[in-house]
Amino acid sequence: MYPSNKKKKVWREEKERLLKMTLEERRKEYIRDYVSLSTILSWKEEMKSKGQNDEENTQEAPQMKKSLSEKVSLYRGDITLLEVDAIVNAANASLLGGGGVDGCIHRAAGPCLLAECRNLNGCETGHAKITCGYDLPAKYVIHTVGPIARGHINGSHKEDLANCYQSSLKLVKENNLRSVAFPCISTGIYGFPNEPAAVIALGTIKEWLAKNHQEVDRIIFCVFLEVDFKIYKKKMNEFFPVDDNNEGTDADMKEDSEGPEPKGLSPPHKKSKAKKPESSKDSSEDESGPEEKQTAEEMEGQSQEAGGLRFLLRNLLGLIHRDGVNTTPVPSPASEDKAEVHKDEDSAKDDNTVKDSDMTNHSVCDQELPNGQENDSAKSEGKTEAESPSSSMETEDLSPNQEDAAIVEQPEVIPLIDDQEAQEGGEAQGKDAPAVFAESQGSSEAENTSGPDVDMNSQVDGVNEPTESLQEDLQ
């Protein structure tokens, strides 16, 4: 069937020879017809040719913007006839040929393709390997192994199918190939549903083209069945619309080729946009600056005042503490009231003791005196109770010795300096009171035993003697 294949025995030599030939030299050795790339319209050209005249196309052609639809084409026919840089073979894992498109490519390429594939040691699912095209119009053949779905697909099947297209496009870029044709991978005997397979193929290639727009001139979707052709024709408008411009993809391409921009640099329009918020921030900072300064100064003043008050309080507390330790404490109103109460109690005790002594002495005298004399004694008692010890009446009745004793005794009884002296004075008087009573009683008894016939003068002297004994005891 392919008589020229009998002459080719060593695949390495044949590969080197064919790869060194020009396109014209290779065409002389084609055994079959071929379809050149120039005869295949891009998707954009095909869509514009429908419903528009040639004149309109020529007028609008200079105004057209570049889009991804210029990079893709839809072709229905035999993939082995395409004169492109590479065609993709939907191979099996052994890469030794099989049914469907794989068998067609091996038969058209000749025995050298099989010989080279034997040295590749097979291929994994989702991966791809490249060989020479040999007797094919295509310069290279890229072999990829698709997933075996058999009518039921899952996430791993979709991922493997997408990897088939990505791996093939990677080899295209690495070998500097400008055109490539893809068949429908895994849709034949492998049982991958046609429409999901078309969606994965179109989406994966569009994503790659957006990043590698300048790396290829044409990617061809080659279908053989009517079902696949209708599906692709419908989906092509969705993935590659004619009005879609590629300005964004060009910018992405430049960024990928030139590398990421430094962080410190940005495009001019971005700088102008960034300056406006900075100026507004500066103005807002300037406006809020005086207020913040004023608040800061007020806070500092308040803190200083608080610190000064604390310092004064500490000093006052220190002075109070020192005064309490080294000097006599300042009497409080409560302590003064207590001192006055103690003084009143002490004076009351003194008065009571004097009264008691007088009452005892007078009671003894009254028992011995007549009724007329009892009245005189009562009168004298009333006078002594009403008058103070320092009155003029007492000084007249008392003798000169008694007057000196009374003058000496007055400062000891009347004023008290402090609480301690008042307490001590009260205790001393309390102790002396019984002695006074005892002595007064003894003297009165001694005088009363002298006899009932004592005259009036002696009785009057007996009335005054208790005061003398009291004064002597106090001395």
UniProtKB/Swiss-Prot annotation:
GO molecular function, a single term: O-acetyl-ADP-ribose deacetylase activity
Principal subcellular localisation of the protein: nucleus
Notes on activation and inhibition: Subject to product inhibition by ADP-ribose.
Subcellular location: Nucleus
PROSITE patterns hit by this protein: MACRO
Reactions listed under catalytic activity: 2''-O-acetyl-ADP-D-ribose + H2O = ADP-D-ribose + acetate + H(+); 4-O-(ADP-D-ribosyl)-L-aspartyl-[protein] + H2O = L-aspartyl-[protein] + ADP-D-ribose + H(+); 5-O-(ADP-D-ribosyl)-L-glutamyl-[protein] + H2O = L-glutamyl-[protein] + ADP-D-ribose + H(+); alpha-NAD(+) + H2O = ADP-D-ribose + nicotinamide + H(+)
Statement: the UniProt record of this protein carries the keyword DNA damage: yes
Basic and acidic residues bias locations: 251-261, 335-359, 376-386
GO cellular component: nucleolus; nucleoplasm; nucleus
UniProt function note: Removes ADP-ribose from aspartate and glutamate residues in proteins bearing a single ADP-ribose moiety. Inactive towards proteins bearing poly-ADP-ribose. Deacetylates O-acetyl-ADP ribose, a signaling molecule generated by the deacetylation of acetylated lysine residues in histones and other proteins.
Protein family (similarity comment): Belongs to the MacroD-type family. MacroD1/2-like subfamily.
Protein name: ADP-ribose glycohydrolase MACROD2
Lineage of origin: Eukaryota, Metazoa, Chordata, Craniata, Vertebrata
UniProt gene name: Macrod2
